[in-house]
Design a protein with these regions (language model features):
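ATP-binding pocket architecture of kinase catalytic cores
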Residues: 46-47, 56-163, 167, 173-178, ...
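Catalytic activation segment of kinase domains across protein kinase-like and atypical kinase folds
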Residues: 215-260
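ATP/Mg2+ or Mg2+-diphosphate-binding catalytic cores
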Residues: 3, 309-371
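Hydrophobic packing residues in well-ordered alpha-helices of helical domains and bundles
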Residues: 81, 130-137, 161, 186-189, ...
Length: 371
């Protein structure tokens, strides 16, 4: 779960823990300064993320700016970023252009999509004002999905789904909550995970961004006109993309890691996505084409997998990696988990388990009632 490379407007100086890497970076940047009209003395921190990557901003002599990705090769593989950026560009999306890449050292020079994220533009109390940006996000998402081809990206398969789900008991329950599950509770999780995986693997597949949300979508500067609707927003943090359930990214967009919308707005945007996807031929599966409710139930099951995973990831980021800011958002995911579990009879045991761990009462229902 990464922050966008242009998040915030920080002008913090760049600090280095390894003198050798600092020297290597300085030499690399200087070597590209003339070709790309860079001003190396202007380098400052743009953002860091949940991984070991960080992003630096550097000015050009013409008054523009560029982004440098610092991805230590012993900790981060920069190749997926380069490869998937090309896929997104081929799909017609607005993504950073790779101007220079040193794979051996883990340095990339990128075009700068600016500092204005969709998240920064959103007032959580005003969904009407946010709606146009969400419609733009849908255009980008559909263009990405329609470009899908099998065998291009790694599969979001059973092994990946289960590995992600296991983060919840390993890190959220055991490490963060300090709870040792009973044999019965462990059996509940095993059965629940089996159900989730079964549902997710049955869904139609396509390209999956995996963190398609407002923090990773960039608003163009005023006066900059996109060539197509799919390019209205810039797209970042795509290096972990896979080929998997097409429900994943709409679930990620509407059940945000850092922002909670009321159910009416979630349904409104998801219906708009469904209508567009249906016209594009993406809903030709079982009764999805004619029944929004059937599609939405699939979105909820996919979202449940993501919520369990992210709760575990956020706990791990805090406890293992020392990034305490993420833990503050875990209650949001527990709310998502409980609300979804309350709606489905098969998930009643999961709801009971979560309530036992959290010391909470059962959540209220959602728009379609209990099924």
């Amino acid at each position: 779960m990464n922050s966008p490379l242009a998040a915030g407007t920080s002008a913090a100086p760049v600090t280095w823990t390894e003198p050798a890497r600092e020297a290597a970076f300085g030499a690399w940047l200087q070597a590209h300064a003339a070709e790309h009209t860079l001003a190396p003395e202007s380098v400052r921190l743009a953002s860091a993320d949940a991984s070991f990557r960080r992003y630096l901003r550097v000015d050009t002599t013409s008054g523009a700016s560029r982004i440098v990705m610092d991805a230590p090769p012993d900790k981060e593989n920069s190749e997926p970023f380069v490869r998937i950026a090309a896929l997104l560009r081929e799909a017609g999306l607005h993504v950073p252009e790779v101007l220079a890449w040193d794979q051996a050292q883990g340095f990339l020079l990128l075009t700068d999509l600016g500092q204005d994220t969709m998240m920064a533009r959103i007032n959580p109390e005003d969904s009407a004002a946010a709606a146009p940006m969400y419609r733009q996000a849908l255009d980008a998402l559909l263009a990405w999905q329609l470009a899908s081809r099998p065998g291009v990206l790694p599969a979001y398969n059973e092994a990946v789904l289960r590995r992600e789900l296991q983060l919840f008991p390993d890190w959220y329950i055991a490490q963060h909550k300090g709870v040792a599950l009973s044999e019965a509770q462990s059996a509940t999780l095993t059965k629940t995970f089996d159900l989730i995986v079964l549902r997710c693997l049955a869904m139609p597949t396509g390209y999956v961004h995996r963190d398609f949300m407002p923090r990773n979508l960039m608003v163009r500067p005023d006066g900059e006109t996109p060539a197509t609707p799919a390019q209205a927003l810039g797209v970042l943090d795509f290096q972990d993309a896979l080929h998997g359930p097409i429900t994943y990214d709409i679930a990620s967009l509407m059940r945000d890691a850092f922002l909670t919308w009321d159910e009416d707005f979630v349904l409104d945007v998801t219906v708009r996505y469904w209508e567009k996807a249906r016209k594009a031929g993406l809903m030709d599966f079982e009764d999805w084409h004619s029944d929004f409710g059937a599609f939405y139930r699939a979105v909820e099951w996919m979202g449940l997998q993501r919520h369990l995973k992210v709760a575990g990831i956020f706990a791990r980021l805090t406890l293992r990696d020392g990034k305490a800011k993420y833990l503050a958002d875990t209650p949001r995911f527990i709310h998502y988990i409980r609300s979804t579990a309350h709606r489905y009879r098969e998930l009643g045991p999961l709801l009971k388990l979560i309530d036992e761990i959290e010391g909470l009462q059962a959540a209220s229902g959602w728009a379609f009632g209990r099924v």
